[in-house]
């Protein structure tokens, strides 16, 4: 069975710098409000996502907030963003517009509107443009994005949402998407694949409805396209050889599928339909590995700690690390080349070093299963080194035990989360973290993997010195109701999913057919309130086919993912299409 979903923002993504040059320069209006939505740490040490809105009047601002909530929660439902959202700060910039909507929407002859970012469809209201190419004034966007203080431009992704239900967007460091379209929230993770991960499109066409032709070039630089056979990849240890034969996270099996990079023949990709080909599916493992590397490269796994240099043997060496949502980073210490067991702090006094000079090294890397290439894993690992001179005496230190950066406490965490804390760094003592789950003591260092919890609300506390932090744990999974209906002829099926949760925030619904990849339920491409339609031939919308389902018996699984990241238990419905 094959479900065809829209794969592109436009037939081809045009670099934003090329399509904004013809737009008039604008002076940014000063009335804008920066709202931090997720702050996981110092913006200078995080990857920062800045979300702007255009064409939203003061009266429209509640809709903008809802649009942003949906976009973010869809993003957090997709790996690796789900596991590494703790590496990302998110800021919403509310820019009241004098008028509602954006220019040339939906037609190229429709009204041109004076909005703060000058967003417009049709490649900037060009009669020879592409309707879905949603552009904006990059200078204005930069001015508003700069209202978020302390965020380095080099470590920032700007996403601008247009007040529109028309499908569209564009890629680049200044990405765009329509805020209210049924599928618009799926544009963001696809575009981040380009701008953050350097991934290529896997479309087998350049213009919708026009076959892409045959690729006749050499072996592409793209890590997820090749001319090699599976046997050649294995024998030569090239491209995605480590993943061959695995069940793809995007459905099917990692292998070799013809078409990609706008060509329909002569070039091959790893999966039948990853998010870089069809919006709605996940990244496959090949692209997910690259995105994990790219997100990790935007930050430093060692955030802080004892400065490198010469120290005495009477002190404590410390490192602060990042804390992924679902696992702990690996911290490995060596003294004179020999491994020693320690956590984030190494108390040199306990080593009883012989008089003289010694070398201490620490390495922090990520043991995630998302990475299989050792070179990729090593590319964002970090190390620190110290010279230990036993003749050096550490001066008195007035630093008190206390908290540093922690997992944010302002929103619930999911039941299977890892909660992370960092502490201050007294020179001659290692602060102890005392953990409790619902009042019961548990043993952990700087990362607490939550134990199995019954459905409901729970509380975790951590105490360091006289300071305490408390987290709320949402252990109640979301639910989803399904309505599957067929006419008497049984030749089609409509599926409507309605997710819900006991906590605030947009709840994502997904389904998969006959064990294929999980697919985001967005309603119907033209209307988020309509159910998804399956037929034997599918429905063609703007030269893309949706809901093609062969005649026969099928099992449809469905589930929900809540704002905290909990998965609901998958349920099934069995249908027969005649």
Indicate where each model-derived feature is located.
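Secretory targeting and sorting signals
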Residues: 1-28
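Propeptide-to-catalytic entry region of secreted or membrane-anchored zinc metalloproteases
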Residues: 28-145, 179, 368-370
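Short pre-active-site segment immediately N-terminal to the catalytic Zn-binding motif
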Residues: 63-64, 168-189
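Catalytic zinc-binding patch centered on the HExxH motif and its immediate surroundings
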Residues: 101-104, 142-178
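Catalytic Zn2+-binding segment of zinc metalloproteases
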Residues: 192-208
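Structural beta-strand segments of beta-rich domains
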Residues: 313-317, 415-419, 491-495
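Long, low-complexity serine/threonine/glycine- and acidic-rich segments characteristic of extracellular
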Residues: 327-384, 410-412, 422-578
């Amino acid at each position: 069975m094959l479900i065809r979903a829209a794969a592109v923002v436009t037939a081809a993504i045009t670099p934003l710098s090329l399509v904004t040059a013809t737009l008039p320069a604008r002076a940014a209006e000063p009335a804008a409000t920066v709202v931090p939505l997720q702050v996981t740490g110092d913006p200078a040490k995080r990857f920062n996502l800045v979300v702007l809105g255009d064409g939203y009047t003061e009266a429209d601002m509640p809709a903008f907030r809802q649009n942003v909530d949906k976009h973010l929660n869809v993003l957090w439902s997709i790996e690796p963003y789900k596991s590494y959202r703790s590496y990302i700060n998110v800021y919403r910039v509310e820019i009241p517009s004098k008028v509602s909507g954006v220019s040339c929407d939906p037609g190229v002859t429709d009204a041109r509107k004076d909005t703060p970012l000058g967003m417009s469809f049709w490649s900037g209201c060009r009669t020879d443009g592409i309707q879905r190419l949603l552009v904006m004034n990059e200078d204005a966007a930069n001015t508003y994005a700069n209202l978020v203080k302390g965020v380095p431009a080099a470590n920032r992704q700007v996403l601008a949402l247009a007040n529109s239900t028309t499908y569209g967007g564009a890629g680049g460091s200044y990405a765009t998407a329509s805020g209210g379209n049924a599928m618009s929230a799926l544009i963001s993770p696809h575009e981040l694949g380009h701008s953050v991960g350097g991934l290529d499109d896997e479309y087998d066409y350049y213009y919708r409805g026009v076959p892409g032709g045959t690729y006749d070039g050499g072996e592409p630089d793209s890590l997820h396209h090749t001319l090699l056979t599976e046997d050649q990849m294995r024998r030569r240890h090239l491209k995605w050889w480590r993943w061959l034969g695995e069940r793809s996270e995007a459905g099917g099996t990692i292998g070799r599928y013809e078409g990609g990079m706008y060509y329909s023949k002569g070039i091959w990709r790893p999966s039948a339909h990853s998010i870089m080909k069809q919006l709605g599916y996940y990244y496959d493992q090949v692209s997910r590995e690259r995105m994990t590397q790219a997100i990790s490269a935007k930050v430093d796994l060692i955030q802080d700690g004892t400065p490198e240099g010469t120290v005495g043997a009477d002190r404590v060496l410390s490192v602060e690390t990042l804390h992924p949502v679902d696992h702990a980073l690996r911290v490995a210490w060596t003294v004179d080349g020999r491994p020693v067991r320690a956590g984030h702090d190494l108390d040199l006094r306990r080593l009883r070093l012989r008089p003289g000079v010694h070398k201490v090294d620490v390495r922090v890397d990520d043991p995630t299963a998302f990475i299989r290439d050792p070179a990729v894993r090593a590319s964002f690992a970090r190390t620190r080194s110290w010279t230990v001179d036993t003749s050096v005496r550490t001066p008195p230190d007035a630093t008190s035990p206390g908290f540093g950066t922690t997992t944010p406490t302002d929103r619930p965490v999911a039941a299977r989360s890892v909660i992370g804390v960092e502490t201050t760094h007294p020179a001659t003592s290692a602060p102890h973290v005392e953990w409790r789950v619902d009042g019961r003591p548990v043993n952990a260092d700087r990362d607490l993997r939550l134990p199995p919890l019954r459905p409901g609300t729970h509380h975790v506390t951590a105490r360091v010195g006289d300071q305490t932090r408390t987290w709320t744990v949402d252990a109640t999974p979301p639910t989803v109701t399904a309505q599957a209906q067929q006419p008497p002829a049984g030749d089609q099926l409509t599926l409507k999913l309605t997710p819900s949760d006991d906590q605030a925030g947009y709840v994502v619904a997904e389904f998969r057919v006959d064990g294929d990849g999980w697919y985001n339920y967005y309603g119907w491409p033209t209307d988020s309130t309509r159910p998804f339609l399956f037929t034997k031939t599918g429905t063609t919308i703007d030269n893309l086919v949706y809901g093609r389902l062969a005649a026969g018996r099928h099992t449809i699984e469905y589930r929900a993912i809540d704002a905290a990241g909990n998965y609901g238990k998958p349920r099934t419905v069995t249908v027969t299409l005649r």
